[in-house]
Amino acid sequence: MVGYVWAYQSLPLRYPSHFNFDGVPDGWTDKNLFSWFIIPAISLALLSFMYFITPLFRKYPQFINIPGKEKFLELSDERKEPVFKLAENLMGMIAIVEQLLFLYIQYAMWSAALSPGNMMPPHSTLIIIGHSVFVLGIVIFYLVKISDKID
């Protein structure tokens, strides 16, 4: 949070808040606490949601969305345990990657606000697309491992 406060103080009175695919600003906002801290607030809310929902997997396994759920629900508690651990690890990995994405988006907005031409850093689009591919890879990796444990 200290970094967000420090960055907020250095923002101009109006800064870019939305960018097109090429990193050119196409939306602007006035400097205010809400507009700057909404992204960290959403990030924290998402992290909190994932933190609190993950333990519910064990209490309400019928709500887990995994391949072979019917077979999973029929397993003994002992055989369900490795699946729960994998599902918890998956949620943890996604939470970490999403936090890093939100942090990067905030950094890119700050960087654009202070740069000539207000452009996002040139690698921003690649990072955001790469993030999506990486998350998809994580999900596939864990779902394959979960399927192996259920079979």
Q: Predicted regions span which residues?
A:
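Active-site and channel-lining beta-strand-loop segments
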Residues: 5-37
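Loop-to-transmembrane boundary segments
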Residues: 78-98
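Hydrophobic alpha-helical membrane-insertion segments
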Residues: 1-4, 44-48, 91-99
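Alpha-helical transmembrane segments and their immediate juxtamembrane interface regions
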Residues: 108-151
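Juxtamembrane inter-helical linkers in multi-pass membrane proteins
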Residues: 60-81
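Alpha-helical transmembrane segments
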Residues: 31-53, 127-133
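Transmembrane helix-loop junctions in multipass membrane proteins, especially transporters and channels
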Residues: 8-13, 55-66, 110-117, 147-151
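Alpha-helical transmembrane segments and their membrane-interface junctions
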Residues: 93-113
